[in-house]
């Protein structure tokens, strides 16, 4: 599945549900590894509150939970014009979608990972600046708990970031990993860095980090495992609008 938000109006999105009023949330799907794609499927009415100004995807990537539930991170501007991050999910392979409660107010671009069976972590861009907001849910977003690392462990300059969970059986370290990438700074969008956590996101030691680009760029990124030894990162760098690099885990995690 690929999730996009389409703005029909020329200038802005407003409360409402129709294309003339508000941005439309669309899905396209592929059943042949991306060779062909379906026509867009409009799911706005399934997940958007009419009072919201708009509802957007993460951006970044969604996940499939161990029980098969599909999950996308989302963000929306509520009736008071405050941004909020959360998740939407499907338990029937994308036929129907559901959205419950926001994870933390005044947050926007987020990424989701299943850190334990049934436990989702949402890592969020926080408009307060300085560091990432992090929350967890055990009930698909009905209730949220602030994570101990929230607003302290991962610095940011108010920018998008990427987060993935890599299970022990799927990587050469034999340990459960969280991998994270963003501009590792509180000012500007520079020092694009990949970090690893071996304790479920509580800590991100400097010995488990690799700097990719220290110069100024746009700073958005997306991580994905290539094989058990290698993670790929697609990011906005200082040398090109979009750059792809393949990084060995042994260059990130020094044991």
Where are these regions (language model features)?
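Asp-box/BNR beta-propeller blade signature and adjacent active/binding-site loops
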Residues: 1-255
């Amino acid at each position: 599945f690929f999730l996009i938000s389409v703005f029909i109006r020329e200038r802005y999105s407003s409360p409402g549900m129709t294309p003339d009023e508000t941005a439309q949330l669309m899905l396209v799907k592929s059943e042949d590894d991306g060779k062909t794609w379906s026509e867009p499927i409009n799911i706005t009415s399934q997940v958007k509150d009419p009072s919201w100004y708009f509802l957007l995807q993460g951006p970044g990537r969604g996940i499939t939970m161990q029980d098969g539930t599909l999950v996308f991170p989302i963000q929306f501007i509520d009736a008071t014009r405050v941004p909020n991050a959360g998740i939407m999910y499907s338990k029937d392979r994308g036929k129907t979608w559901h959205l419950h409660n926001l994870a933390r107010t005044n947050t926007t671009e987020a990424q989701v990972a299943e850190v334990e069976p049934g436990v989702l972590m949402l890592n969020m861009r926080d408009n307060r600046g300085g560091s990432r907001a992090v929350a967890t849910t055990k009930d698909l977003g009905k209730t949220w708990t602030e994570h101990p690392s929230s607003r302290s462990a991962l610095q940011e300059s108010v920018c998008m970031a990427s987060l993935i969970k890599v299970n022990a059986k799927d990587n050469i370290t034999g340990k459960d990993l969280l991998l994270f990438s963003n501009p590792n700074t509180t000012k500007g969008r520079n020092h694009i860095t990949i970090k690893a956590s071996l304790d479920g996101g509580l800590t991100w030691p400097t010995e488990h980090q690799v700097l990719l680009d220290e110069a100024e760029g746009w700073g958005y990124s997306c991580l994905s495992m290539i094989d058990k030894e290698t993670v790929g990162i697609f990011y906005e760098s200082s040398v090109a609008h979009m750059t792809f690099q393949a990084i060995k885990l042994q260059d990130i995690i020094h044991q």
